[in-house]
Amino acid sequence: MNSLKSIIKDRKMILRLAKNDFKNKFAGSYFGLIWAFVQPVVIVSIYWIVFEKGLRSRPLPEMPDFPYLLWLIAGMCPWFFLNDAMNTSTNCLIEYGYIVKKMKFNIDIIPLIKIVSAAFVHCFFIVLVLAIYIVYGKIPTPYAFQMIYYSIGVFCFSVALVYLTSAINVFFRDMAQIVGIIMQYAMWVIPIMLSESQYPAFMRPILKINPMYYIVEGYRDSLIRHIGFWEHPLQTVYFWAVVIIMFIIGRTVFTKMKPHFADVM
């Protein structure tokens, strides 16, 4: 509880450091911050060409004429956020090692710096997604405001995971590479490129175990199906229960290891 209070107290510092981190990530490159937004657009374009133009994928049997691109970007949007947050935040304590060694600095906020930095790109991507929907003539309904709720959800899930992975990475430096590999495989056990109906029947219950299933499908409920999150009470309770449990585990490990961080930097 004390750590949460200290994080809230230092929220302005978190925001300031996150802005600096976001700018420094592309400092020195000719196009600068443009690269932060170009990369997800290029990735989406590749998947769109492969799955819709090449494989003729139709993910919604009940809506066979619904554009695959719109279905894809609704699922990719939260995934990009989690992927960016995990891959950049796991190594955050090493990257900010010079700060960790300062006894008076609240190192509890360091993992949040990277996640907030990733959230900046996520906000842009949400705007881009809404713009593409409008171009296609799919005007977002009030259900689209639910993306704020689901964004908070993926943010909290990222925080819960990163406290664990960043703490372990200080003592086991291969953790960052392991997380990167896991994230590559994890994309395919969530219905992002393929719909749930396109997976084998035995895999469909397994998909729902992944907390990101709730988030990805939530974005699509907000933009495509127009279904409220309150219409999935069991999934909602399950998701937040997992987040809380993972946060408790992550914070416990982080707190136990924190006194030794500076010694191994």
Which residue ranges define each predicted feature?
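Hydrophobic transmembrane alpha-helices and immediately adjacent juxtamembrane helices
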Residues: 1-265
